[in-house]
Amino acid sequence: MNANGTIRTLLLALSFTTAAAFAQKNPLDEISSHDGLAKVNVKGIDLAYKSADVDIARYGKLIVDPVEVAFRKDWNPTRPGSNLKLSAADRENIRTGVAKVVQEEFEKALKAGGGWQVVNEAGPDVLRLKPKILNLYVNAPDTRQAGVRTFTLTSGEMTLLLEAFDSESGAIVARVIDRQESRNTGQWQLSSSVSNVGDTREIAARWARILRDRLDKAKGAGKK
């Protein structure tokens, strides 16, 4: 299966994968096995796969590709207080806003404390990260309409598909998939662009911390 075919199949599988299914055998296991990846356990991540033939410790630099974002197929909201569908411009603003927040949190975590050097060119010691946000679902998009207030239990949910490749050969090194829903306090909260962005940033920062921790551990293991 070529790379494009794998991604298309992954997207299809993810669109039908529920939270409960993440804990059981699912099509993603077979797809990743097809790519020569073995399933591994990563605390805080639903699914993780790694190539047994590649030592991540060999990499000292990273390329972080621009974050891609796709909405969940059944997400078709109306403007708050109206029966009008959300405009294409509003949808694009949400998509680019989420991409920007995730990109910022990943690069901030990776660079923190002089950790990993993020570069733009491929090299023998460069690992390419390709982050994608899939199945983005925003419960109450804020279109800043006067006199309209919306309350929700959660801001929404999104799924991370992060793949790591050797920057020169293009060989896949690792793949992780994780679905996250924003915090649910059990109380109705006023929804706004500020709260939506804040919840997105919280989830992205969590993913970024786990990524940084795993990369640091791999690098440390390679020095022993």
Spans of features found by a protein language model:
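Soluble periplasmic/extracytoplasmic beta-strand elements of cell-envelope proteins
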Residues: 48, 61-70, 126-134, 161-163, ...
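Bacterial N-terminal signal peptides
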Residues: 9-19
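N-terminal segment of the mature soluble domain
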Residues: 59-128
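C-terminal/domain-edge helix-coil "capping" segments
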Residues: 24-50, 157, 168-175, 182-224
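N-terminal secretory signal peptides
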Residues: 24-66, 70-73, 108, 112
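Bacterial N-terminal signal peptides that target proteins for export
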Residues: 1-11
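Extracytoplasmic/secreted envelope proteins and their assembly/folding machinery
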Residues: 95, 99, 103-107, 133, ...
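Surface-exposed short loop/turn segments
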Residues: 108, 112-171, 182-191
